[in-house]
Curated annotation (Swiss-Prot):
This is Conotoxin Pu5.2. InterPro entries: T-conotoxin. Its main location: secreted. Contains 2 disulfide bonds that can be either 'C1-C3, C2-C4' or 'C1-C4, C2-C3', since these disulfide connectivities have been observed for conotoxins with cysteine framework V (for examples, see AC P0DQQ7 and AC P81755). GO terms for cellular component: extracellular region. The modification Isoleucine amide is found at residue 63.
Length: 64
């Protein structure tokens, strides 16, 4: 009976693991998330850089 809780916990851990895709990706297949992450980071940096100069006099500041 001592093994039952351990067995239940192992079953829960196995069930919560992400599924594996059965089809392997070809060598030239690049996930789009890598491109979107760089675009989002550049957009955020540009926005912050543009807000640095105009928020001093509050004329074009979008933050409060």
């Amino acid at each position: 009976m001592r093994c039952v809780p351990v067995f239940v916990i192992l079953l829960l851990l196995i069930a919560s693991t992400p599924s594996v895709d059965a089809r392997p990706n070809p060598k030239d297949d690049v996930p789009l998330a890598s491109f979107h992450g760089a675009d989002n980071a550049n957009r955020i940096l540009r926005t912050l850089w543009n807000l640095r100069g105009c928020c001093e006099d509050k004329t074009c500041c979008f933050i409060g």
